[in-house]
Amino acid sequence: MPFKCIFLTGGVVSSLGKGLTAASLALLLERQNLKVAMLKLDPYLNVDPGTMNPYEHGEVYVTNDGIETDLDLGHYHRFSSVNLSKYSTATSGQIYARVIKREREGVYLGSTVQVIPHITNEIIEVILECAKENQPDVLIVEIGGTVGDIESLPFLEAIRQFRCEHAANCFSIHMTYVPYLKAAGEVKTKPTQHSVQSLRGIGIIPDAILCRSETPLSNEVKKKISLFCNVPDSAVFNVVDVEHSIYEMPLMLSREKISTFITEKLGLFTKQEDLSDWKILIERLRNPLPNKVRIGLVGKYVQHKDAYKSVFESITHAALSLNCAVDILPLDSEDPHFLEALEECDGCLVPGGFGIRGWEGKITAAKLCRERGIPYFGICLGMQVLVVEYARNVMDLEKANSTEMDQDTPHPVICMMDGQAALVATGGTMRLGAYPCTLSPGTKVYEAYGQSEIMERHRHRYEVNFDYIQQLKDHGLNIVGRCPQQGLCEIVETENHPWMVGVQFHPEFLSKLITPHPLFVGFIQAALLYSKNKSHV
């Protein structure tokens, strides 16, 4: 096997941070001059998370090739430089669909199709396909869910088989939670012992145990885990809850020397990772910054931060690059009093979304920003909000709307894209993935990007109606970015406003801590200027 494989499983509880751990490991290995690929295996039966409720699953992250994926792939992107595509994700739904399709085609020649060997073989095939596509030195495979869940069993069995065949090239990390009982004044290792016992019962013996805890674990506790989980002392690692930011995780793992331990066990003798640039940014996060802005994020899933995970992170990236602290204020567009809080903000961001709930509240937010000169950034649905508000209140088009919200609107300034109306299925049928966009010179977005040709990722069915584009321009709402292939409106800017920009794509999917997205940087710069001007009034 020409590549090494790291398997990451989780036990005791869900939401341990396996995705962040996998992303951090990818960064550390890349900084050792290794080429890394990543694969997320999710046990749920949905084909993808594209139609799942954000309250249940969080945001949907979209790759360049138009695949709707788990938000963990967003972590992979923000921490590392791995190439993410359809080969980087697989769900039980996809695996079963592939097997059933082959059965219908007669591939199995009349055999009884079973979880073992057919489903497990398909999972192994997915792993090999990812490696073949990316040709990595190391492939990191994260298995969603928790050891002990019924849904995870086929994936764990597939890993067991894979490890049997390629033992020298595989490394298994089991991540667990070590709780601290305040009443007893001590940490408890028993849940970790039982979790490892369950994993061993399946036939997987972990090569390392990564213990998450609220406080650092003593050497005595680590030795106890080592003894009862049958791994060497040196194979027990500890990560504590981060103090300031998730971006501290790679530094924490680096101090634990886990990547060095892994590479030595796999026979990959590389240089020590260089994280000097990362450390500089983390120091900024830890220390008071000279400037601060407050950004109002107006949406309908604001009670669940994971629903807008990439947006939150992109704002942080941009602010940090400008040596600026940021206070992100989630505002529910259905709250009758949210405008009072928005008035105190230095900028407003309306992210993507679907459906009529909270729609009118978002329009009132755009109106407030336009009239008060508050910087406004509309993403996907947020751009459509900007256009509808402008049509109603500047162009005097009474009851202008999107046909998504009102099929009978007299002024459909936002309408469904050609070809979408005939589609019956909802999953995977939108305009998805990266498309080119040509920017108009002399505009705010051109200034932000510093170039005229860009590529951005999309996830939408609706667009600005061609029939209203000239009217919009005549009234001061300029179309400053278009798709050269179809002429679709991708970016709008309002004249005579400090920064009122709407984009049909999702720039948050491209932002990283090291390289923040230029539009988010431009937005935070405008918010900083607004804040300074406001303080002098």
Swiss-Prot record:
Pathway in which the depicted protein is active: Pyrimidine metabolism; CTP biosynthesis via de novo pathway; CTP from UDP: step 2/2
Family of this protein: Belongs to the CTP synthase family.
GO BP terms, alphabetized: 'de novo' CTP biosynthetic process; pyrimidine nucleobase biosynthetic process
Keyword Ligase appears in the UniProt entry: yes
Disulphide-bridged cysteine pairs: none
Binding residues for Mg(2+): 72, 142
Quaternary structure annotation from Swiss-Prot or TrEMBL: Homotetramer.
List of residues binding L-glutamine: 55, 353, 381-384, 404, 461
Regulation (activators, inhibitors): Allosterically activated by GTP, when glutamine is the substrate; GTP has no effect on the reaction when ammonia is the substrate. The allosteric effector GTP functions by stabilizing the protein conformation that binds the tetrahedral intermediate(s) formed during glutamine hydrolysis. Inhibited by the product CTP, via allosteric rather than competitive inhibition.
Protein name: CTP synthase
GO CC annotation terms, alphabetical: cytosol
Residues that bind ATP: 15-20, 72
Miscellaneous: CTPSs have evolved a hybrid strategy for distinguishing between UTP and CTP. The overlapping regions of the product feedback inhibitory and substrate sites recognize a common feature in both compounds, the triphosphate moiety. To differentiate isosteric substrate and product pyrimidine rings, an additional pocket far from the expected kinase/ligase catalytic site, specifically recognizes the cytosine and ribose portions of the product inhibitor.
